[in-house]
């Protein structure tokens, strides 16, 4: 009887498999990839870093957890090139790859000295994905890209990162890099490899961006939208919000909105998951409130919320130099300056129910263009790691300015050039002369 039962059980299991299917045991052997430069993250900083390193001749691998590059522009949907130009004169202060991307998106001339807005927008975030894809493909043979790939572990020896472990459709993959550039936004590689960092117990709120179609353009739309959200909040349908920014950016009857405010810890998986769900809930609550109370939305429909909620702040490495508010506001100059910033100190309050988008008075915290030194991209304790983007070394106040789109691109380009220079000269990034990095950037227009 037992044998018959086992036979029937096996037969039933076999019948559940498609014709010709076989059971496969996963191989224990990992795929191993050796590369000169590993760029972790394909957002604004990471895309610029990967392009800069590969264009400078280094064999480069960029890994990104999304199925496309562009980070806050494409995954979060923020189309602004914040930090590219002086707020009053509109003079372009960041050139290099950032200006190249803006020009190739059709927003300005490639040799622009001044632009119409200090924070111009690109016309189409999907086409920005295509632009990055095309630029990556132009570096074929020098640049490999792995999308849908998560960094999940690091191995260090004698102050060097020797291996980085990825998880993707190949299983667990071991990467053996000579230089690593952490552009993860959250300093994941730096933190897991043991580099010192800091993270405030309460960070800036997370924001989901979304779009609504078939909206009538009326002069009082922003005022009415704000009044409707007050009613929704009073009814318990919307916990926090700011603004909101209701902007006709992409089409004459379509609005793009950022006004959601979700307090959360973006380096805690469970809390980040909660924030993603809360953001979607809040976006639809806003839409319902406007449909109910604002005539311009009578025939409107919800187009989409972008895939990821936007993160403003998480870990910041403690580097060889910690860039401070005073450095920015005093316009302090550095011999090893490798990037320029010009955005105001933009610190969003975490838990206020309504109100403005900044804990600072922007009139009092608008610096002139300022230097970002190479040392603020260098973490302590690890010789072959560079960090670029919003997780670089800065105080919380300075980071409120340096975290934005174009400043991240400028840091990423500098890190990519530095990584290639380190490979070429056989010198660890930690031992590179920052002035040499600056000279190398000048040669490529960065």
Predicted ranges, named:
Residues 1-15:
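N-terminal secretory signal peptides and thylakoid transit peptides that target proteins
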Residues 16-30:
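Bacterial Sec-dependent signal peptides at the C-terminal "C-region" and cleavage site
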Residues 32-43:
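Beta1/beta-strand and adjacent pyrophosphate-binding region of the FAD-binding site
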Residues 46:
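N-terminal Rossmann-fold NAD(P) dinucleotide-binding loop
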Residues 53:
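Aromatic pocket-lining residues of Rossmann-like dinucleotide-binding sites
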Residues 58-59, 64-153, 207:
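Conserved N-terminal/central alpha/beta ligand/cofactor-binding core
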Residues 72, 147-148, 167, 172-179, ...:
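Flavin (FAD/FMN)-binding glycine-rich loop and adjacent Rossmann-like elements that form
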């Amino acid at each position: 009887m037992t044998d018959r039962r086992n036979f029937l059980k096996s037969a039933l299991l076999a019948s559940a498999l498609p014709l010709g299917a076989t059971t496969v045991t996963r191989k224990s052997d990992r795929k191993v990839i050796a590369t000169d430069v590993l760029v972790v993250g394909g957002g604004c900083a990471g895309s610029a870093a990967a392009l800069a390193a590969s264009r400078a001749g280094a064999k480069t691998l960029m890994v990104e957890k999304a199925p496309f590059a562009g980070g806050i522009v494409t995954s979060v949907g923020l189309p602004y090139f914040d930090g590219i130009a002086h707020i009053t004169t509109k003079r372009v202060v960041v050139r290099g790859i950032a200006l190249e991307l803006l020009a190739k998106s059709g927003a300005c001339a490639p040799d622009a000295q001044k632009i119409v807005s200090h924070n111009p927008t690109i016309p189409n975030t999907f086409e920005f994905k295509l632009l990055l894809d095309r630029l990556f493909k132009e570096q074929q043979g020098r640049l490999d890209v792995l999308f849908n790939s998560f960094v999940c572990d690091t191995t260090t020896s004698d102050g060097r990162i020797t291996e980085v472990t990825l998880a993707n459709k190949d299983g667990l993959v071991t990467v053996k890099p000579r230089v690593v550039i952490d552009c993860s936004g959250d300093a994941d590689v730096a933190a897991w490899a043991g580099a010192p960092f800091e993270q405030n117990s309460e960070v800036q709120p997370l924001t989901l961006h979304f779009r609504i179609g078939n909206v009538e353009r009326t002069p009082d739309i922003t005022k009415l939208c704000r009044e409707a959200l007050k009613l929704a909040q009073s009814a318990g349908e919307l916990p926090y919000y700011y603004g909101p920014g209701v902007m006709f950016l992409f089409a004459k009857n379509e609005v793009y909105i950022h006004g959601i405010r979700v307090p959360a810890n973006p380096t805690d998986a469970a809390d980040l998951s909660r924030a993603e769900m809360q953001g979607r809930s809040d976006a639809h609550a806003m839409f319902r409130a406007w449909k109910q109370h604002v005539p311009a939305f009578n025939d409107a429909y919800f187009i989409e919320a972008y895939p990821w909620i936007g993160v403003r702040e998480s870990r910041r490495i403690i580097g060889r130099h910690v860039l401070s508010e005073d450095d920015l506001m005093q316009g302090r100059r550095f011999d090893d300056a490798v990037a320029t910033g010009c955005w105001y100190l933009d610190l969003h309050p975490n838990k206020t129910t309504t109100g403005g988008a900044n804990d600072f008075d922007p009139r009092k915290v608008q610096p002139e263009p300022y230097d970002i030194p190479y040392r603020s991209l260098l973490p302590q304790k690890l010789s072959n790691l560079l960090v670029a983007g919003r997780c670089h070394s800065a105080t919380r106040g300075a980071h409120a300015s340096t975290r934005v789109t174009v400043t991240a691109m400028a840091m990423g380009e500098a890190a990519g050039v530095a990584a290639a220079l380190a490979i070429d000269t056989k010198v660890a990034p930690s031992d590179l002369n920052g002035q040499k990095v600056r000279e190398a950037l000048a040669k490529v227009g960065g």
